[in-house]
Amino acid sequence: MRLLSFKKSKIVSIGTELEFQIIDRSSLSLVSRSKELMRALKDMRYRDQIKPEITQSMIEINSSIHQSAKEMYDELLELQKILVETAASIDIAFCGGGTHPFQQWTMQKIFPSKRFKKKFNQYRYLSKRATVFGQHIHIGCPTGDDAIYLTHALARYVPHFIAISASSPFYLGINTNYCSSRSTIFNAFPLSGVIPYLRNWQEFSDYYRKMYRWKIIENMKDFYWDIRPKPELGTIEIRVCDTPLTLRKSILITAYIQALALYLLKEKPVQLSHDLYYVYNYNRFQASRHGLEGELTVTDKDKPILIMDDILETIKKIEQYINGLGNSEYIEELYSDVINKQNDSVLINKIYKQDGSFTKLVAAQCELWLSDSKDRKWMTQPS
């Protein structure tokens, strides 16, 4: 079979998508207001970079393509500013976090687009249950073969990404005792989890065309894998991260993945084999459940290691790529978080323990969401 086309991208160019919670300013619950928000944004700058998601209590911002994490950060701040200015007119707030701590998925409303209505008819309750919030990170690849290699090679580091981004310990009003409960939600979808063991772009093209011919998929969006190729963009997309509480944390995560991807593409240190996937689900569980203190089984080591220790070792290993990309400031901050066993899940638990109040927790999350821009006049707080 002929190859699928793959749009050539600059090596490790970056882009991100961030899904945020739409919050009622009085009750601090999720509120289905994305239709109103999209109408209010109709004539705004960056309108095409702010999008609805499958349920109406979600909103997504999309960065453009960048080489620099700092430039991406500046753009995300501008997108945040537009959201806040628009929200003021319709009395809503926003926050990060992978889950809303006390929302009930049964109360969610599907956004009335053709695509989302079709997905709801296909997946029914799973669609509403997917009212959880993630950060997706795109990494540019020069070729389809590079994209397949990177998709597999990064699978070894998926526990890192879950652990450093974890921000969803509460779900449906309970303490799940998971650092990232969000990362367990999509397991029920078909074509979720890990990409099949396809070794190059030719094998992937053959697989894609068969799945299309068999009417299992219509397009690349029907694959819910943790990491998937996006040939129309010339990227691979990492989909396992919870939405962080702050924009800055989203940049730390992106900067780490960018440097790691450059190391992997330049040095090709990961030998692709089935062994990678023998331990994949177990390692993923460890990160979801225990975060930075989860145990990681590495196939070329005799005994498990802590995820946090593996992250710290990896940062040292890829230092030259971190420096070359200008990401040192962000990785130093991430290194400090990891060595001190800090992620957003830890912070959320700490805030909740102060008052035992979910509404106060959400109010704090709304404040944290704006903390990157605390010196800006347009900053507003939930009432």
Swiss-Prot record:
Keywords carried by this UniProt record: ATP-binding, Ligase, Nucleotide-binding
Entries under NCBIfam families matching the protein: gshA_cyan_rel, PRK13516.1
Function: ATP-dependent carboxylate-amine ligase which exhibits weak glutamate--cysteine ligase activity.
HAMAP family (alphabetical): Glu_cys_ligase_2
A matching Pfam family: GCS2
InterPro entries registered for this protein in UniProt: GCL_type2/YbdK_subfam, GCS2, Gln_synth/guanido_kin_cat_dom, YbdK
MF-aspect GO terms: ATP binding; glutamate-cysteine ligase activity
PANTHER family: GLUTAMATE--CYSTEINE LIGASE 2-RELATED
A biological-process GO annotation: modified amino acid biosynthetic process
Name this polypeptide is given: Putative glutamate--cysteine ligase 2-1
Enzyme Commission (EC) number: 6.3.2.2
